[in-house]
Amino acid sequence: MLVQLNHKVHVLFRRQDLDMVKLQGKTVIVLDILFATSTMIAALADGAAEVLPALNEGHAREKAAGFERGSVVLAGELFADTIAGFAPPTPMALMAHDLHGRSVIYATTNGTVALNDAAGAAHVYAGALLNAAAVVEHIARHHADTTILIVCSGSMGNPNLEDMYGAGCFVELIANTLGAHDLSDAAWAARALYRSEAAESLLMRCRVGQMMQARGLAEEVKFAARESVMQVVPKLVDGRLAPFALA
């Protein structure tokens, strides 16, 4: 599908709609609310030195081979199941591990793939409800003159309600900070969704949220529904997400 990116703020509802050529010069925020980007942000807030988003289990193990034993934590999922031998992919469960000062290599079905897909942009950030205000503050300060593209990871080629909602949260904050005069229709739609319902309510009733509750992960969903409670701004540089310190 051809997506026009001639607006100041645009939203893609699926990672598959990314156009690698049109990424050049743009600022990209990648979202996977349940749970990839929420987990990576939480890990960095909990003291991890960095997070390396991997495409899959094999890619993660390949990356881990370059680290000293004990300095790295492998975590992730495939089709929502924890990869055998890896730490769990959800925020609270991963934070139960000793992450302080260690590198986290993290592989997921959608979110980490989207981050890798977006790597050709001028600036790439991992965003979630958890750090929305911090990311927008940073972008407004450093990249206000660029086109901002919010990428929803989605699920297996389909849009996810929680990612669309998260995109709306970012659009709302960007509009309040930089103005709402040049939003794409997709950005307006995401903003309307965000304004329609509280975060926890929507995340608990969406398809992925219900699936996670059936797996006993209701508290993880509630954790990911908290808005702007973390100051971590993870920027992707050379395949690594490290926290960008707010000035």
Q: Can you name each region flagged by the protein language model?
A:
Residues 1-12:
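N- or domain-start disorder-to-order transition segments that initiate the globular core
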Residues 9-10, 26-29, 49-52, 70-74, ...:
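Structural motif
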Residues 26-27, 153-159:
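A short glycine/serine-rich beta->alpha loop
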Residues 39-46, 63-64:
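Short active-site loop/helix that positions an aromatic residue
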Residues 85-123, 137, 161-247:
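Long, charged alpha-helical interface segments
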Residues 149-155, 178:
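Glycine-rich anion-binding loop/nest that anchors nucleotide
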